[in-house]
Every structure is written in structure tokens, then in C-alpha cells.
Amino acid sequence: SNYTTREDLYNLAENGMIERRRRAGSLVARRSPEQELVTLEIPDIGLAIGGRDRAYSYRLLHKALREPDAAIYNEVALAGDDRLFAIDGVHLADGRPVGVEHRLLNAASVPEGLQVDFTLTSPGTWLLQEVSWTRGEYRITAEGASEQDAEVLECAPGQACLVIERRTWRGEAPITWARQIFLSSEHELVARFTTGGR
């Protein structure tokens, strides 16, 4: 529900894990030396759904090898001088849509991705199993479903959703950017933290 999403984001902000900014959304907070080390893992969505005793499946909606859109900074930054492999799909639990995923792969960093049959496995699962990465970045927001995403999610436009944008790199080479839109009642974020021995 919208209340649950707001409450979760409030709790993350209260614990210093995210910064909430008017008109900019919620961003992962910068860590000062005095703060705890907080880790958000990259989850395998299929395993997470299966862990709740639900049957997971992924449906590929669209894939294309293309040039980056010069007007979109994230695409240009991800592609550099290379092309992008765009993949759109939907995550399902017990046959019902719970999340839409829009993903871009740097075709030069992950050329083997062009040969993968994403009707058999989700891009996220394949990446976690086959592609090493050294650093990542999260951006987590609460948003209303767009008309296009609402149609795929079988919900009303504007329904509360948890939106996760994630980028990963191997060294300085960009690997992937993903935007995942989940129905707010269908996804959770789990963070583990330590106090640094204090």
C-alpha cells in the first residue's frame, strides 16, 4: 500500500540509509566515517519470490540492440561509444505481475548477453550468475505507476509502486542499468549493517 511504502522510506531515512529530497526523490545517503556500514544486496527476484512460497516466472516483453538516446544522460553514460542491449520484461508471482523491469546492457562490456534466451531466464538472474561486477549504485523512490507500466502490472495508473534504479560497473566499465517498478505490496528491501566494531 502507499502507506507501507511511505513508512518504509521514512524508516530508511530515519536510519540514515537514504536522503529524502523534495522533487528529487529518495537517494542512498552518503556515508560519513561515523555511520554504520550498510549493504543492500542485489537480489535474485526469482529466489525472493520463491522464498515466499510463490511460483516465479519472467515474461520477456521486448528486446533490441540499439544506439543510446543522446538526450538521455544515463544511456549515454552507460553506452559510451558502444551500443545498448535494451530488455523489457515482467516478473510474475503465481502468474500475476508484480514488477516491470526496463534494463539496458552495455553491449561491449557484456557481449555474451546478446546470445542469451531471455524467455528462459530473467536478465537479472543471468547477470548475477554469469557476470562479475565490482561496484553498484542504487536509487530508490516511491512513485505512481505510469500508464504503460500500469497496463503491464494490471493495476490502476498512479498506483503506489516501489521503484529501484540500479547501475553496476566492473572497474570503470559500465555493465548495466535497470529500472524496476514493483507494486508496493509485492517487494521489500533488506539491508544488513554493522557498527564497525564500536
What are these regions (language model features)?
Residues 20, 41, 119:
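Short acidic-hydrophobic sequence patches enriched in Asp/Glu that either
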Residues 47-56:
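Histidine- and aromatic-rich ligand-binding microenvironments
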Residues 27-41:
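Short, cationic-aromatic polyanion-contact patches
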Residues 19, 50-51, 77-80:
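Short, charge-rich binding segments
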Residues 1-29:
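N-terminal helix-turn-helix
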Residues 45-47, 121-122:
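Acidic/proline- and glycine-rich, intrinsically disordered low-complexity segments
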Residues 57-198:
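C-terminal all-alpha effector/ligand-binding and dimerization domain
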